[in-house]
Curated annotation (Swiss-Prot):
Catalyzes the ATP-dependent phosphorylation of L-homoserine to L-homoserine phosphate. Its EC number is 2.7.1.39. This is Homoserine kinase. Signal peptide: none annotated. Belongs to the GHMP kinase family. Homoserine kinase subfamily. It comes from Pectobacterium atrosepticum (strain SCRI 1043 / ATCC BAA-672). The gene is thrB. It holds the Pfam family GHMP_kinases_C. Keywords: Amino-acid biosynthesis, ATP-binding, Cytoplasm, Kinase, Nucleotide-binding, Threonine biosynthesis, Transferase. Its main location: cytoplasm.
Length: 309
């Protein structure tokens, strides 16, 4: 049997709409991500379990893990009968790369089980294709960090899909999921078709500056440049309490705060555990809206998807 864990990820990381992503894991060692296991069988089967299993489609063929199996078999040119189990620990429509977790874990599990017939680049292309079926367009800002780990910059040139960006080891990423759903398609539809020239210039400056600061080890500068002029101004209306949470993060001394992916999860960067804990407590008391919500203090997950056991 092969069992793969794929971690949560922050799409965009505020400053890099559709071109930047970061994988995260809780500092307490708990698994914030999905697991998929594969074992030999006479016929294909898929079983679902985990905290958020009730959110999955009733029809197995609509399940993204079934589609992983189907696409993988097409790619290698043969049908592989297996029993797959999806452990759905990630809320759907959370802004934590939930669909990417299932896609990455599903495809990587099949590839490992079959003796790695596909290299990482081919596997990543399939992951992007499947992610596109869910969100409406192929993009890698969740699947690339989830699969490869760390902070990834999407390039999609010269046969290179993404490359790693140096990160800051002392940064703590406070993740708060309020327990409500925002669909990626809805969050994309709310964005304007065209942007003002000044916003385009600002976006280029922030993103280029952030990448430069990461490569030159300037943590304070990098944090200051984590600004989103593309999506956040429009998406905040989908997120009750976001403005108050952002203000609280600033008051507590967070270095940066933004929307994780399409939301509603919020992320905030702190450089000491005391501030991170204070902010986590505030978010738990004020940003969560129901029992499904949660707050985790995380670090970057530099490993990405991996085999368990």
């Amino acid at each position: 049997m092969v069992k793969i864990y794929a971690p949560a990820s922050i799409g965009n990381v505020s400053v890099g709409f559709d071109v930047l992503g970061a994988a995260v894991s809780p500092v307490d060692g708990s698994l914030l991500g999905d697991c998929v296991s594969v074992e030999a069988a006479d016929l294909f089967s898929l079983r679902n379990e985990g905290r958020f299993v009730s959110k999955l489609p009733d029809n197995p063929k609509e399940n993204i893990v079934y589609q992983c199996w189907e696409l993988f078999c097409q790619e290698i040119g043969k049908t592989v009968p297996v029993a797959m189990t999806l452990e759905k620990n990630m809320p759907i429509g959370s802004g934590l790369g939930s669909s990417a977790c299932s896609v990455v874990a599903g495809l990587m599990a099949m590839n490992e089980f079959c003796g790695k017939p596909l290299d990482d680049t081919r596997l990543l292309r399939l992951m992007g294709e499947l992610e596109g079926r869910i969100s409406g367009s192929v993009h890698y800002d969740n699947v690339a960090p989830c699969f490869l780990g760390g902070v990834q910059l999407m390039l999609e040139e010269n046969g290179i899909i993404s490359q790693p960006v140096p990160s800051f080891d002392d940064w703590l990423w406070v993740m708060a999921y309020p327990g409500i759903k925002v669909s990626t398609a809805e969050a994309r539809a709310i964005l304007p078709a065209q942007y003002r020239r000044q916003d385009c210039i600002s976006h280029g400056r922030y993103l280029a500056g952030f990448i430069h600061a990461c490569h030159t080890g300037q943590a304070e500068l990098a944090a200051k440049l984590m600004k989103d002029v593309i999506a956040e101004p429009y998406r905040t209306k989908l997120l009750p309490g976001f403005a108050a949470a952002r203000q609280a993060a600033e008051d507590i001394g967070a270095l940066a705060c933004g929307i994780s992916g399409s939301g509603p999860t919020l992320f905030s960067v702190c450089n000491d555990m005391a501030s991170a804990q204070r902010l986590a407590d505030w978010l738990r008391d004020n940003y969560l809206q129901n029992d499904e919500g949660f707050v985790h203090i995380c670090r970057l997950d530099k490993t990405g998807a991996r085999q368990l056991g």
